[in-house]
């Protein structure tokens, strides 16, 4: 990378190994979010697992999806609730949901 990207200062040192975030090109953000949300809704829409916390999360997610959330988009909302989702998926022993969440974390956050 000879020239810095527009708006970013040039590095004054060489990286020994590239950071994993060289580019977001080719990452399926929407697909990753959609898979994690499908797992999440399976639990939080079930009265046995839903509660006021998850009801508030769903309302905030609807606002983000509608573009009504000025300070929070869907990805940020998911990012800020990772630990709660991990707890829920671990409680349910849902290894597939945990794997999809890990992919979302590693590729998109």
Curated annotation (Swiss-Prot):
Any matching Pfam family: CowN
Keywords for the protein's UniProt record, in alphabetical order: Nitrogen fixation
A biological process from GO: nitrogen fixation
Keyword Hydrolase in record: no
Keyword Nucleotide-binding: no
InterPro entries: CowN
Function: Is required to sustain N(2)-dependent growth in the presence of low levels of carbon monoxide (CO). Probably acts by protecting the N(2) fixation ability of the nitrogenase complex, which is inactivated in the presence of CO.
Family to which the UniProt record says this protein belongs: Belongs to the CowN family.
Protein name in UniProt: N(2)-fixation sustaining protein CowN
Organism: Xanthobacter autotrophicus (strain ATCC BAA-1158 / Py2)
Source taxonomy: Bacteria, Pseudomonadati, Pseudomonadota, Alphaproteobacteria, Hyphomicrobiales
Gene: cowN
